């Protein structure tokens, strides 16, 4: 399927949430949110299930976390990829937890009790927030950690997105955790353009998500969160209990795939889609083919 057709179908599917509906055991409905990495990982899940012989319906581009979770609870979708940090902070309104195992344990327990949603095995991929720079700036300014950026900030220009300036796990939280971070200038951009500003010399530091494709394609440096401020954001399939009870093999299939979705793999695949303009379905297919999973159908 071409990228344009996939996007058109995704937009159509995600534009309206249907009324609540009963579980349809003849197919597995896989959802996604409205950004590249969510499309990609949802497509990996969908193709893995298809390779195992299941019928899959894709309901992508649902929008925000709130919309995706509502679709799950209504029974409009059976599973989608979610991040532990997003569930912890945006859904459960808890404080950030840097420890990946602890964050996963909390969200999996509460989601099962409160929403009848099961978290399957998480991937090692951790799409946390971060600050990035070029290797040249990191070397010339001698900045490797966030503590060093906090001190050097009055001589540095920040490129970021608007919400980073107000979120508790954005700039205000960094200032509380590290002190400093009084940048010489702060300018806001669209998500992709903040990296352009960095590469064109209009900024010295950019806010980042640590699996962004630009980090791989532009060879950027992610600065070390040496005080472990940011929460873990490991991705995992979240599945309705009713769907899992009817098709327990969903867990076996997706738990076999999740360990292979690493930071490096995610950055590479995101770059293939965003920079090289490859079709997410093709990228997902190549990834699954490389795994050579036993029992998969081709």
Regions flagged by a language model, labelled:
Residues 37, 163-177, 248-298:
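An extracytoplasmic/periplasmic, membrane-proximal ligand-sensing/linker region
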Residues 1-14:
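N-terminal secretory signal peptides and thylakoid transit peptides that target proteins
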Residues 19-20:
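C-terminal motif of bacterial Sec signal peptides marking the signal peptidase cleavage site
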Residues 27-57, 62, 124-196, 200, ...:
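Bilobed "Venus flytrap"/periplasmic-binding protein-like clamshell domains
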Residues 129-139, 234-247:
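A bilobed periplasmic-binding-protein/Venus flytrap-type ligand-binding module shared by bacterial periplasmic
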Residues 64-65, 75-88, 103-107, 134, ...:
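Beta->alpha turn/N-cap motifs
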Residues 73-82, 154-156, 173, 199-208:
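Alpha-to-beta junction loops
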Residues 91-120, 200-202, 214-228:
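Ligand-binding "clamshell"
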């Amino acid at each position: 399927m071409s990228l344009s057709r996939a996007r058109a179908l995704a937009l159509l599917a995600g534009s309206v949430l249907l009324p609540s509906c009963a579980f349809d055991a003849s197919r597995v409905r896989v959802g996604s949110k409205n950004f590249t990495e969510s499309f990609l990982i949802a497509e990996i899940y969908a193709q893995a299930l298809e390779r195992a012989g299941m019928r899959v319906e894709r309901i992508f581009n649902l929008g925000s976390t709130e919309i995706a979770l509502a679709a799950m609870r209504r029974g409009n979708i059976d599973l989608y990829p979610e991040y532990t940090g997003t569930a912890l902070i945006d859904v459960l309104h808890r404080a950030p937890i840097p420890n990946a195992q602890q964050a996963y344990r909390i969200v999996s327990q509460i989601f099962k009790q409160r929403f009848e949603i099961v978290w399957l095995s998480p991937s090692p991929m951790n799409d946390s927030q971060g600050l990035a720079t070029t290797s040249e700036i990191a070397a010339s300014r001698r900045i490797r950690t966030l503590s060093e950026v906090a001190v050097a900030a009055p001589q540095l220009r920040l490129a970021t997105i608007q919400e980073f300036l107000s979120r508790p796990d954005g700039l205000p939280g960094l200032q509380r955790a590290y002190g400093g971070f009084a940048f010489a200038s702060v300018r806001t951009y669209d998500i992709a353009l903040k990296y352009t500003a960095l590469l064109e010399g209009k900024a010295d530091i950019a806010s980042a998500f640590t699996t962004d494709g630009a980090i791989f394609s532009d060879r950027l440096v992610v600065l070390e969160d040496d005080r472990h401020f940011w929460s873990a954001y490991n991705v995992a399939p979240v599945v309705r209990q009713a769907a899992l009870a009817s098709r327990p093999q969903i867990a076996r299939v997706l738990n076999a795939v999740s360990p292979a979705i690493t930071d490096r793999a995610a950055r590479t695949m995101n770059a293939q889609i965003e920079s090289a303009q490859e079709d997410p379905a093709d990228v997902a297919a190549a990834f699954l083919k490389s795994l050579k999973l036993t029992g998969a159908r081709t």
